[in-house]
Every structure is written in structure tokens, then in C-alpha cells.
Amino acid sequence: NNLVILQKPAHLRHRTASLVLCIVIINCMLSALTGCNSKKLALSSPISVTDYKLNTYVQIDSYTNVNKNVLSDALGLCDYYEHIFSRTLETSELYKVNTQQTTAISDELYELIELGLYYSQLSYGAFDITIGSVSRLWDFNTDTPDVPDSSAIADALAYVDYTKVSLSTDNDGTHHISIPDGYCLDLGAIAKGYIADKIKAYLIDNGVERAIINLGGNVLCIGQKRNGSDFNIAVKKPFTETGEYMEVLHINDYSVVSSGTYERYFYSDDGTFYHHILNPATGYPYDNNLCDVTIISSESTVGDCLSTTCFVLGLDDGMKLINSLEGIEAVFMTNDGSKYYSDNAKAYIN
């Protein structure tokens, strides 16, 4: 067996971030394909493309023999959607919405905002896509992060309330959004899952039958390995750089998404720990004893939304939500390293 570990190269790591997921692929090195009716040649070693997009390390490994340009074009979708969903990019569609430059929005932005509002409601506002007025005060990507002024946070909280956002569609199909002046939508917690699903659809449309898409904390599989076995997805243990894994999940044609306190964080001068998952009620990071939530689902969009939603709901309410949903499983990890599993999560664990 040939064990391959995919993780973010040291020169691409930000000092306050660590890659959420590693992909572990075990190739059995079969000498011939048997019983395979695929129209395209299945590979034992992948065709790979890598890049740095969406503020993370991204990679596609195709186990179908296709032109490498197909994979590069698929990763190019990251740029396309960033110009729609980015809160900070001044040329993006969302930026223009947040700055009241437009009310007419694209199908893609309408779809993602509608989804964000649904999960904001599902969490009773514990997750809120209007957190942008607060999140723009926190910069977890700078080399010198600092805690925002408390009065600035208090002022920003006056502009956090997802119920003030409304969507509509004209008879001709044109979508519109209405948000109060001063409000700022932030779709960063859910956009990568949506983009991963779009990349998967593009690859399938272009003949890819077996592949792994890795957008940092979002891993999405197409099909299974050429011998019919599952892909093995290793969920990195929080706050480690030594290759320790929280779990190794066995999936095919499914998604694995993790959200946690270790993705972006810093320590203040007095040693206080601050991470990027902010509480819409306080403007400060959540402190609910969770450090990671990993979601197993068929769609990465759903996994992205639920990983954040379940994190902010906390262990008890988050677990209740997952166990009420069909076809979705989760693994929760608390700060002491204890792991908690949804009803059928262990079916994906060795």
C-alpha cells in the first residue's frame, strides 16, 4: 500500500492558521482493472492541480484520466465565485450589496444568501450572516492581530440582525435584496461549501468519475477509488502540526467539512485566546468548550452550513440538530480532546 498525505506546505501556512483536513489516500496498486465498466481510464496515481485561492490551499486529485486543463479550469471557479461572494473584494457583487451600490443580485448570490438566512433562522440567530459589521473589525490574517475596541464592537452589534434582510424576485426572474444601511453580510462561513459543490458538478460534466476536491476545510469526493473502496479522509487533530488525526473517515461520493477554533486565531498580549467564530450576541468569539465540528454529508454546501451552525449551537443543541436530519452525521470535539458522535457517524470510521 502507498500512503499519501496531502497537507498545506509549510511555506503557505499562516502562523495563526492550520489546515483543517488532510487527505489520506491509500492506493492498492492493482496490476489490472477488473469488472470496471467506466468509459474513462481509472488511475492508480492521481492527476493533480494545486493553487492558493479563497485564502486557503486548494487541490484537485483526479483518478480519472482527463486533460489537466479540466482540473485547472475547475479551480478557476474559485476566482469566479470569489468575485460574487467576497465581503472584502471591492469589485465583488456582495461588496456592492453591502455598500448599497445595487439591489439586483445574481442567481448565485440569491441562492447563497437564501441558504444563509435559513441557517440563521435554524440556529435562532446564533449563526447570523449579518455578522459582517462585527467580523470586519477582527483581522485574523494580519501578522499583528489585535482585539478591536469594545466600543466599536458595541456599535457594530446594532447592525447585526438577519431578520432585517429580505429577498424578492420580479416577474421577469430578476432577484433583489433589501438590507438596512450600515448592515454588512458575511458569507465566509458557507461560501466554500457552495463553491466545492459547483466544482464537483463541473468536473462530472467534463467526464471526471473519481476525484477528491480539497478546499482547505472542505473535502468533497467524486465516486470512489478505482478498486471500488472508499476514500480515506483524515481529519486533522486541532492545534497539532505532527500529523495527528482526530479521525479517519471512509467515504465515497460524499463531503467532509470541519469548522473549529484552530482555523484562524491569535493570542492577545495577556495570553487570551481569540478565534474567528464570532458570537452575534456579543461580538466576541464563542466560548462553548467546542474546538471542532466535522460534518459528513452528500453536499458540501450543507456540510459547510451545518458545521458552523452546530458549532455555534454548542454540543447538546448541535447534536440534537444533526440527529434530527437524515443522511447527515457529525463528530464533535471539546477542548479537552473528548469526541462525541452523532447516531450513525461511526459507520464512516474504521
What are these regions (language model features)?
Residues 3-5, 9-22, 26-350:
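Mature catalytic core of soluble alpha/beta enzymes
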